[in-house]
Amino acid sequence: MWRVLFLLSGLGGLRMDSNFDSLPVQITVPEKIRSIIKEGIESQASYKIVIEGKPYTVNLMQKNFLPHNFRVYSYSGTGIMKPLDQDFQNFCHYQGYIEGYPKSVVMVSTCTGLRGVLQFENVSYGIEPLESSVGFEHVIYQVKHKKADVSLYNEKDIESRDLSFKLQSVEPQQDFAKYIEMHVIVEKQLYNHMGSDTTVVAQKVFQLIGLTNAIFVSFNITIILSSLELWIDENKIATTGEANELLHTFLRWKTSYLVLRPHDVAFLLVYREKSNYVGATFQGKMCDANYAGGVVLHPRTISLESLAVILAQLLSLSMGITYDDINKCQCSGAVCIMNPEAIHFSGVKIFSNCSFEDFAHFISKQKSQCLHNQPRLDPFFKQQAVCGNAKLEAGEECDCGTEQDCALIGETCCDIATCRFKAGSNCAEGPCCENCLFMSKERMCRPSFEECDLPEYCNGSSASCPENHYVQTGHPCGLNQWICIDGVCMSGDKQCTDTFGKEVEFGPSECYSHLNSKTDVSGNCGISDSGYTQCEADNLQCGKLICKYVGKFLLQIPRATIIYANISGHLCIAVEFASDHADSQKMWIKDGTSCGSNKVCRNQRCVSSSYLGYDCTTDKCNDRGVCNNKKHCHCSASYLPPDCSVQSDLWPGGSIDSGNFPPVAIPARLPERRYIENIYHSKPMRWPFFLFIPFFIIFCVLIAIMVKVNFQRKKWRTEDYSSDEQPESESEPKG
């Protein structure tokens, strides 16, 4: 089993102003010239659209890719997932072509005007309704990359070109409809990048899936967007780090949290300001529930059209379709889908003969069975809870599907007629549900997978495991030699093992001083347009990854050059990958690697670790725990949160976020219990206090009255005494 990472050649240096032409936006008014309606739904339509002064006829046919029970999900402020109260129509998405251009592709929605993409063979145009227009005006603009500097031409021009090859018939032997049910997650930064509006973001995801569907027409595959999840307030997992690390983190999260949302494959879409890699997935594992997933990294400068190509390539790789060898693989278009350069080209893209052969091999195997089930694509106009559709909706406590579905999975907790829990049940499924009851709060539901990760426990009142937490970034790890970064110990030894395999360890300082002072394949601090960058003295530990080899045989890494150097008795090794190699980023030290006291590597420079924002002092958790990524103390075993100052022998450790909080009081240790209850504001100890307050107030008032009365009596006595003495005083002679 192996995973595939995408390298986007040169994308890290792309700038919108230097790589994309500034193209004029045109105003057009689409004219509907034909419409066919079946059962109240417009199944076909034709529009006349003017592009650059020339009218084109666009023929459309309805293309459903949203199931009847499609929902968009987000999380509440308490971290509970909930469906958004929005209706999204599934009958207004269309696919078609431009008349006179048989190799053209059109993918638009007509829910609110025409919104989508028109692709000629090598030029693409975007179209969307003009806001606040009263005359059905639309804007249309060319999506053009400088690298695809070609002009629009029609079919007769295509026929006149000298095609040096002809495609053989390599269609899959079983030409039946196939379906890929996909759950898509948009993380917070990409949500903000796409407009920070649920309707706008959903429309863009619909357009992305529509474009991807157009690519897979030749395979007779429909990509079904089974559900959409938006991380609006915060990400549920750390989305930093390299693509392969993020893939593993996502798949672990997916296993715990996506059990209630049926899907064949799940994809996490992540925004990156710039990135060399654009995604990761496991090859040929489309129908393997443990590995059917991928991550798509969306660099700032690419278009939605290019993002669809990336998604299509990832889906293809997960079906065992490999990258094209441009010397052996051919297609009738300007560029083939599985050409790594395809994302740089506008226009229609199709699969090569090699891709057809790979797909035919995949579909002939048992491992492709998940593509054979057809979801319901009935039109829907308003979302309503439907008991028996295997989807948990508003007003339902459970929904295991039809009677046959529930019997198949052995459902015993859910009343299939009412979609309510049976008497005596409080859950039906989930990592913290057992025999229809919530597991007790001391039950671990997600163990830590390494020292910078933290375990989570069932909270005793939910079937779900709490969200994943990890040690705060910046905390020491690896015997205080390294630092935790987003839940992973950024160990030099681990980086060496990941790059070279066994029998390696992190290189000594002599190796770094000698090799990274060079400016060649053996040592450097990165690559720029002018060549290798020389490391300054302070940055030697942050340049090329240099390891110490203790093995006996020469290392073998495909498509890589391994450099050996004997320095001060150490066999130091470095590696040089081709620029388009999936592991090319492993040539250098990762960001977050320690490079000195209170210093870490960042972009091949050794900088202060203060930028990590680590502020967990030993006093905060009384030296009996660590801070988690929410900056709360995760206490060691037998010490209680929130500050790990109180001891309880039966407490397994944890934080206020780990699920097993608050702790159960231990009757044998009454003083400790009182202290704990004061910490957590437990109600049983507070009601006597509130009962005492009115009596205390009354007592104070009575005391005040008594004092005042006593004072008044003294005052009266003083006045009486003064009045008795006054005449005598006045009779004194005035001298």
Swiss-Prot record:
Cytoplasmic face residues: 708-735
Glycosylation sites noted in the Swiss-Prot or TrEMBL record: 122, 220, 353, 459, 566
PTM characteristics: The prodomain and the metalloprotease domain are cleaved during the epididymal maturation of the spermatozoa.
Keywords for this protein: Cell adhesion, Disulfide bond, EGF-like domain, Glycoprotein, Membrane, Phosphoprotein, Signal, Transmembrane, Transmembrane helix
Domain Peptidase M12B, chain residue ranges per copy: 178-375
Propeptide regions on this chain: 17-174
Stretches assigned to the Disintegrin domain: 384-473
Pfam families: ADAM_CR (PF08516), Disintegrin (PF00200), Pep_M12B_propep (PF01562), Reprolysin (PF01421)
Disulphides: 287-370, 329-354, 331-336, 445-465, 616-627, 621-633, 635-644
Record-annotated membrane-spanning stretches: 687-707
Residue positions, PTM Phosphoserine: 729
InterPro entries attached to this UniProt entry: ADAM_Cys-rich (IPR006586), Disintegrin_CS (IPR018358), Disintegrin_dom (IPR001762), Disintegrin_dom_sf (IPR036436), MetalloPept_cat_dom_sf (IPR024079), Peptidase_M12B (IPR001590), Peptidase_M12B_N (IPR002870), Reprolysin_adamalysin (IPR034027)
Location within or outside the cell: Membrane
GO cellular component assignments: cell surface; plasma membrane; protein-containing complex
Gene Ontology biological-process annotations: adult behavior; binding of sperm to zona pellucida; cell adhesion; fusion of sperm to egg plasma membrane involved in single fertilization; gene expression; male gonad development; positive regulation of gene expression; proteolysis
Membrane topology, from the record: Single-pass type I membrane protein
Signal peptide: 1-16
Tissue expr: Expressed specifically in spermatogenic cells in the seminiferous cells. Not detected in fetal tissues.
Domain EGF-like: start-end pairs: 612-645
UniProt-recorded Gene Ontology molecular function terms: integrin binding; metalloendopeptidase activity; metallopeptidase activity
CDD domains cross-referenced by the UniProt entry: ZnMc_adamalysin_II_like
Regions of this protein lying in the Extracellular compartment: 175-686
Remaining remarks: In mammals, exists as a heterodimer composed of an alpha and beta subunits. In human, fertilin subunit alpha is a pseudogene.
Domain comment, as recorded: A tripeptide motif (FEE) within disintegrin-like domain could be involved in the binding to egg integrin receptor and thus could mediate sperm/egg binding.
Record-given protein name: Disintegrin and metalloproteinase domain-containing protein 2
